[in-house]
C-alpha cells in the first residue's frame, strides 16, 4: 500500500458515486490511512471496506422495509408476554420469526382468540423479526386493505393492485372479523387470498374461529373455499386467554386500592395528603354527628314544652 501511486480523491469519489458505494466513499480515507500504517495487503483493505459497504446496505434495507411495513410501534417478541399465553410455544414462534422455509413455500399463519389476547402484538412482533432477517412484510387492518382493493376494482385496477402486494413475502391482515358481511368487500378479500395461495404468505388475526366465518363471507361456498386455501400449509395459534387490557386495568385498579403502609422520601407527601384527607373526613363526620345530636335534642325539648 505504501508504494501505491497518488490517488485523486475527487476522481475516486466520483467513481464511487457512479458505482453506488456510499459507505466506501465515506470510509475509505480512514481505512487507507490505517492500511498504510499497519502494512495491510490490498486484499485485506478491499475486504474490510467491502464488508462495511454490505453492512450499511443491510442497515438501509431494513430501514426502508420497516418504513413500508406499517407495523404498530413497540411490538416486539421481547415484550410479548409468552407466560400469559401458555398455549403458544415460544420456541415455535422463534422458529417462525426466522422465516426461511415456510415463507418460501407461501405458507400461512392464523391467530385466533378473543379481543385483547395479544394476537396483533404477536403478529406485529413476528413481522418485525422477519424484516430484521431480510424479508418484506406489510401490516394492515383488513378493513383498510379491503377498502383499497374495492377502490381498485371500481377503477378496473384490482388485478394490478393485488399484483403489487406480491413484493411482500408476508401480508399481515389484522382483525379479519371487522370486515362487513358484504358481497363487494368479501369478494375482493377472497380474490386476494386466492391470488396469494401457495405463492405468498398471509398472516391473519381474527376473533372468530372458522366455524363463525359465515359472519364475514355471505356465501357458504366462498367461506369454504377461503378457509381451504388458508389452512393448507398453515400454522394455527388459538390464543383463548383473558384480555391483556382487562388484566392490566384490573391490576392497576388493585394497585390504586393499596395505600402505602409506610412513608418514604418519594411517597411521604402522598401519605401526608391521605392522612389529612382521613382527618378531614373524620372531622366532617364528627360535625355531622354533633349536628344530628343537636337537632335530636331540639326536637325532644320542643315535644316536652308542648
Language-model segments: which ranges?
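N-terminal nucleic-acid engagement/recognition segments and initiation subdomains in replication
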Residues: 1-40, 290-292, 296-306
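Conserved phosphate/pyrophosphate-binding and hydrolysis machinery centered on Walker-type P-loop NTPases
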Residues: 2-6, 17-21, 35-43, 70-71, ...
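Short hinge/gating elements
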Residues: 11-14, 30-34, 79, 108-112, ...
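Interdomain "pre-motor" coupling segment immediately N-terminal to P-loop NTPase/helicase cores
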Residues: 13, 17, 21-73
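Non-catalytic alpha-helical coupling and interface elements of nucleotide-dependent molecular machines
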Residues: 21, 33, 51-55, 85, ...
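AAA+ P-loop ATPase motor domain of ring mechanoenzymes
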Residues: 47-104, 243-256, 279
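Conserved P-loop
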Residues: 88-167, 216
Amino acid at each position: 500500500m505504501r508504494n501505491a501511486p497518488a490517488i485523486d480523491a475527487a476522481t475516486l469519489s466520483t467513481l464511487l458515486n457512479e458505482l453506488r458505494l456510499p459507505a466506501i466513499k465515506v470510509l475509505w480515507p480512514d481505512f487507507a490511512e490505517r492500511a498504510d500504517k499497519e502494512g495491510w495487503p490490498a486484499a485485506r483493505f478491499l475486504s474490510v471496506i467491502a464488508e462495511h459497504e454490505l453492512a450499511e446496505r443491510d442497515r438501509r434495507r431494513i430501514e426502508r422495509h420497516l418504513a413500508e411495513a406499517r407495523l404498530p410501534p413497540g411490538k416486539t417478541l421481547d415484550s410479548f408476554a409468552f407466560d400469559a399465553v401458555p398455549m403458544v410455544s415460544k420456541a415455535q414462534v422463534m422458529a417462525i420469526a426466522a422465516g426461511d422455509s415456510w415463507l418460501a413455500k407461501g405458507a400461512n399463519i392464523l391467530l385466533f382468540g378473543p379481543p385483547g389476547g395479544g394476537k396483533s402484538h404477536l403478529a406485529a412482533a413476528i413481522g418485525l423479526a422477519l424484516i430484521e432477517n431480510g424479508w418484506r412484510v406489510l401490516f394492515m387492518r383488513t378493513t383498510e386493505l379491503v377498502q383499497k382493493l374495492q377502490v381498485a376494482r371500481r377503477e378496473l385496477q384490482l388485478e394490478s393492485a393485488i399484483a403489487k402486494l406480491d413484493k411482500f413475502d408476508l401480508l399481515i391482515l389484522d382483525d379479519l372479523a371487522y370486515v362487513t358481511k358484504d358481497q363487494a368487500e368479501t369478494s375482493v378479500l377472497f380474490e386476494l387470498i386466492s391470488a396469494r395461495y401457495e405463492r405468498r404468505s398471509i398472516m391473519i388475526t381474527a376473533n372468530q374461529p372458522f366455524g363463525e366465518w359465515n359472519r364475514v363471507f355471505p356465501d357458504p361456498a366462498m367461506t369454504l373455499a377461503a378457509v381451504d386455501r388458508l389452512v393448507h400449509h398453515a400454522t394455527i395459534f388459538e390464543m383463548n386467554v383473558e384480555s391483556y387490557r382487562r388484566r392490566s386495568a384490573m391490576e392497576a385498579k388493585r394497585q390504586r386500592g393499596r395505600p402505602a403502609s409506610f412513608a418514604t422520601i418519594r411517597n411521604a407527601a402522598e401519605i401526608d395528603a391521605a392522612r389529612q384527607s382521613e382527618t378531614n373526613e373524620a372531622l366532617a363526620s364528627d360535625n355531622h354527628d354533633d349536628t344530628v345530636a343537636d337537632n335530636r335534642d331540639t326536637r325532644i325539648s320542643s315535644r316536652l314544652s308542648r
